[in-house]
Amino acid sequence: MSLDINQIALHQLIKRDEQNLELVLRDSLLEPTETVVEMVAELHRVYSAKNKAYGLFSEESELAQTLRLQRQGEEDFLAFSRAATGRLRDELAKYPFADGGFVLFCHYRYLAVEYLLVAVLSNLSSMRVNENLDINPTHYLDINHADIVARIDLTEWETNPESTRYLTFLKGRVGRKVADFFMDFLGASEGLNAKAQNRGLLQAVDDFTAEAQLDKAERQNVRQQVYSYCNEQLQAGEEIELKSLSKELAGVSEVSFTEFAAEKGYELEESFPADRSTLRQLTKFAGSGGGLTINFDAMLLGERIFWDPATDTLTIKGTPPNLRDQLQRRTSGGN
């Protein structure tokens, strides 16, 4: 992995009681040792693989102002990180879920792009076996489950300040307002809505195939084609490019997909991140609620599975063997 650390700082927030988070600040930067580089590379890998929300700094963002001064050489990185940790402590203290942790600030370069990554990492306990085959306690940073993380694409921010996607962050687990306090700390507002872009793409594809007067099988083939392209981009860590997708769909209609999307006003960006859960709707129907979970291939609708919107009834012809076996055993037992 071609990742180079420029500067990295680590501080700590300790929760002493329900009202107080104590600051423990380092007086020097971390040295980019092999272990430190390996840790940052793992955090970069884990973060890059997760679904993220996009944002941009507000004009009043204190973090953006001090970061800009740091980038201009008017403040050193350690002082910037210490002051930012203090502001993070003030925001975290407003929320009852504040648990503290290790606060990491890392300025690094990956594939010619500069990033600033900010994360709050938890320290977990575990066990290890030493060279004498004794079992001893140990501690480790829980990188895989880190959900208080934000990353600023410094290259994008400085070369394209009007962008709505240079800042990304994780929204956290359900029921925790991680995004709320992190947005306050960053002084940011939500930018590009990747999920909305993906939903718009799905609607545009459906309308595109309808206007081309394709039959059911042809329309599903186009959806599968779109899904294959988008999934390949997702797996490669690349964004969906409308021009590239339009080339994939050449021949579907006399009008190109990019021209169709622009004329119909779907407001799709030239490129945007793929959203896995939204894209699945191209090839599958899925839903759950009231003790019922249903998931089936889209091509089965109208063939083995039929929906009556008037009565909201779903009819399935031919159940899966394992389900049929369970049903037969249950009904034959009289339960």
Swiss-Prot record:
Source species taxonomy: Bacteria, Pseudomonadati, Pseudomonadota, Gammaproteobacteria, Enterobacterales
Family annotation (InterPro entries): Nucleoid_associated_NdpA
Domain of life: Bacteria
Pfam family, one: NA37
Protein's UniProt name: Nucleoid-associated protein YejK
Primary subcellular site in the record, as a coarse category: cytoplasm
Keywords: Cytoplasm
Subcellular location: Cytoplasm, Nucleoid
Any one GO molecular function term: double-stranded DNA binding
The keyword Cytoplasm belongs to this UniProt entry's keyword annotation: yes
PANTHER family: NUCLEOID-ASSOCIATED PROTEIN YEJK, PTHR38772
GO cellular component: bacterial nucleoid; cytoplasm
Family statement drawn from the similarity comment of this UniProt entry: Belongs to the YejK family.
Species in which this protein is naturally found: Escherichia coli (strain K12)
